[in-house]
From Swiss-Prot:
Gene3D superfamilies associated with the record: Metal Binding Protein, Guanine Nucleotide Exchange Factor, Chain A
Record function comment: Involved in calcium binding and microtubule stabilization.
Compartments, as annotated in UniProt: Cytoplasm
GO cellular component, one term: cytoplasm
Transmembrane segments: none
Lineage per the UniProt record: Eukaryota, Sar, Alveolata, Apicomplexa, Aconoidasida
UniProt-recorded Gene Ontology molecular function terms: calcium ion binding
TCTP domain sequence ranges: 1-173
UniProt key word Calcium: yes
Protein name: Translationally-controlled tumor protein homolog
Keywords, sorted A to Z: Calcium, Cytoplasm
Length: 173
């Protein structure tokens, strides 16, 4: 099993237990990011998401009001919601990309130019669809670490989460 940690905060943010998909159904961005499909699960009800996932026609309306319904990846990795304005995001992402580029220049210089090209397209997509996104950070609440990008695709009841690959460290267990 692989676990993905944030490069700067060291927070666990995802694992390979979730299929990695092309971000926003755009294969051109797969060199810089991956997307995972989440499910809503009833915490403490131990249905393991079966009753609430899209494929099984899950119906949230039949949830016991005393049971908390959570997004599986957000809950498992203790991701914290981070409200951002477009201006805040623009300021953050410029600094974060500079930080990642500096790290890449030190550790993997041949990756710098492809990263810059792809991440530019990624950021353009986020800014063009900004109101459709929710943002998360790892459990340490390190606001200088990487963001997790959440958005809802079509009529899905659970968000898709998108991660920038170069901001993650892969660990095998």
């Amino acid at each position: 099993m692989k676990v993905y940690r944030d490069l700067y905060s060291n927070d666990e943010v995802c694992s390979d237990a979730y299929d990695h998909l092309d971000p926003f159904d755009n294969p051109d961005l797969s060199s810089v990011a991956f997307e995972v499909k989440t499910s809503k699960v009833a915490k403490g009800e131990e249905d393991y998401g079966i009753g609430y996932n899209d494929e099984e026609g899950g119906d949230q309306m039949n949830v016991d009001p005393n049971v908390e319904v959570v997004v599986d990846v957000v809950d498992k990795f203790a991701l914290q919601s981070l409200p951002l304005t477009k201006k805040d995001y623009s300021s953050y992402i410029k600094k974060y990309i500079q930080r990642l580029v500096a790290t890449l220049q030190e550790k993997n210089p041949e990756r710098v130019e492809p990263f810059k090209t792809s991440v530019s397209e990624f950021v353009k997509h986020v800014l063009a669809n900004f109101d459709d996104f929710e943002f998360y950070v790892g459990e340490s609440l390190d606001y200088e670490a990487g963001l997790v990008y959440g958005y809802y695709k079509g009529e899905e009841v659970s968000p898709r989460l998108v991660f920038l690959k170069d901001g993650l460290v892969e660990e095998r267990y």
